[in-house]
């Protein structure tokens, strides 16, 4: 399982990036209830800023036992599609649904689980490394290169006039008491 605070770190990073001119207090006041998280546009979609090609890769990794991101037979059917459906269209509808964020959260969790699986296969445990997982979530599968000294980074995000990297923002959130009553540390 993915610690909900770690998963949320990636989503909050996307939200801060989208609302980069807002202060932390503004973000907390408007988005804390998690009822009106922004649906991002242009190249990434939904509350989690998912790219359609990343979602397609997550799906492929679920069913490809040769993939370094494969989670095992027990996870192959975690994402299903209606028979004879256009999977691309269904995926897009799922990650852009503003009334139901289930698939956005599911895909973020699956992405992180797949990254963790890749690193575990290489002998490294990053399952509790919020900043590293958020960095890799921000950068994408092709930047995930397991090593003994992973670095927090990613896109720059301005918060209250201060610049953070995407991963550093997630790490700061994870270690803070922000939303701790709703998302306690596991």
Residue ranges and their predicted role:
Residues 1-186:
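Catalytic glycan-binding domains that act on GlcNAc-containing polysaccharides
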